[in-house]
């Protein structure tokens, strides 16, 4: 008897037109590194007091799906997931924060034992991007969804794009004043940011799965680490300077740019960890900018 191996696993997806309903048609293969998609159920326990002290009733309650998909960021393959994270659609290769959710059916297939878990009503609740020297650009999509079923039939898949992952060597990070002209900062050692939508299921009487998901604000926070070269970055924190941050990454042929047109630096810590170079550790929050009508603007190459 075979045990399912991670090396024989695949993810694929299709966009839903009706929340929680898998449409007809081919799924699209989704490159990934790891995932933790799972169905959970609440428990509903009886409260009767028994003379022998032992409970009699424990039932399954509300159902919901959650988990992370971790992947190397690349061209094309995750464009629909970027739309889901931003609640908007691409317009001439530009994507801004919007208000229209996008939902998926996602299949987790174990090829060696021919078992497929189908997750429905899935959307991107959080999106985290991590950049550092000597590594691929990592994206973590925190998914929330409606329900899951399991079966022995794999969905027909269209192939992924085959695009190479983006790396930090092909990227730049620029810093400047809001609505100004940012300049390349060649002293940055790392950057991470997370977009949080706070999707959550809304449960009603008569169903153990949510008829819809509610959504919160598009909150974006991140961190930047840079060599302590002068006072410029620290002054942005001290003076509460509204700052524009732009980071562009690529694969040698294609690029994607994440622009935060109006950010606030909320900390600038400089410690001494030993005899080597000192590092400034900064945190930032991205705010709505009137000129861009967004707090995050994503631009992909044509």
Each language-model region and where it sits:
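Signature of extracytoplasmic/envelope-associated structural regions
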Residues: 1-302
């Amino acid at each position: 008897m075979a045990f399912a191996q991670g090396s024989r696993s695949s993810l694929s997806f299709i966009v839903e037109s009706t929340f929680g309903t898998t449409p007809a048609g081919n799924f699209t293969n989704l490159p990934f590194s790891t995932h933790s998609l799972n169905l959970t159920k609440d428990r509903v326990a009886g409260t009767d007091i028994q003379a022998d002290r032992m409970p009699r009733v424990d039932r399954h309650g509300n159902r919901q799906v959650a988990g992370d998909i971790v992947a190397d960021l690349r061209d094309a393959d995750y464009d629909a997931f970027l739309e889901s994270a931003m609640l908007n659609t691409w317009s001439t290769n530009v994507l801004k924060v919007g208000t229209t959710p996008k939902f998926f059916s996602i299949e987790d297939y174990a090829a060696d034992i021919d078992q497929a878990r189908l997750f429905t009503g899935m959307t991107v609740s959080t999106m985290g991007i991590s950049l550092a020297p000597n590594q691929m650009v990592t994206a973590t999509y925190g998914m929330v969804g409606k329900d899951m079923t399991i079966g022995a039939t794999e969905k027909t898949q269209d192939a992924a794009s085959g695009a190479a992952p983006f790396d930090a060597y092909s990227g730049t990070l620029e810093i400047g004043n809001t609505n100004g002209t940012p300049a390349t900062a060649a002293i940055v050692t790392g950057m991470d940011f997370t977009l949080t939508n706070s999707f959550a299921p809304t449960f009603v009487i008569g169903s153990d799965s949510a008829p819809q998901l509610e959504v919160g604000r598009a909150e974006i926070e991140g961190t930047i680490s840079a060599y302590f070269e002068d006072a410029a970055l620290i002054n942005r924190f001290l003076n509460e300077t509204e700052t524009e941050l732009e980071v562009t990454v690529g694969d040698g042929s294609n690029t994607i740019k994440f622009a935060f047109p109006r950010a606030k630096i909320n900390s600038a810590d400089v410690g001494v960890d030993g005899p080597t170079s000192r590092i400034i550790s900064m945190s930032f929050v991205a705010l709505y900018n009137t000129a861009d009508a967004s707090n995050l603007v994503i631009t992909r190459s044509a």
